[in-house]
A protein has these predicted regions:
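STAS-like cytosolic regulatory interaction modules
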Residues: 1-58, 62, 66-115
């Protein structure tokens, strides 16, 4: 059953890329939902991802672990967008900011240019 604490919305682009917009809490109870959503995107051929944290109120170690799982699963690029100071601090302190770093790119603009 989907959590009431995390909403995941996906924008798919014809370039094999997608933006995943999160709202709520990314924690022990909800992190598997993000991993599953990204796995489904990969199965559908979306390998380049932006994960938009603009609506995330809380991210705990399980949320960080989900990002590592996504990274290790072979997604070509993961860009983390709109990180609040707490999440940015966690990523910096754990070394994940460097591990997950990807060059900035505007997937929506790129999709418009292709289409």
């Amino acid at each position: 059953m989907p959590s009431q604490m995390l909403t995941i919305e996906v924008d798919r682009f014809g370039t094999g890329a997608a933006r995943v917009r999160l709202t709520g809490e990314l924690d022990f109870d909800t992190a598997p939902e993000l991993v599953d959503a990204v796995a489904a995107l990969r199965r559908d051929g979306h390998q380049e991802l932006e994960i938009d944290f603009g609506g995330v109120d809380l991210c705990d170690s399980s949320g960080l672990s989900a990002l590592v799982v996504i990274h290790r699963a072979g997604t070509e690029a993961i860009r983390l967008l709109n990180l609040n100071p707490q999440i940015k601090h966690l990523l910096d302190r754990t070394g994940l900011a460097e591990l997950l770093a990807a060059a900035p790119r505007d997937l929506a603009r790129d999709a418009r240019e292709v289409g």
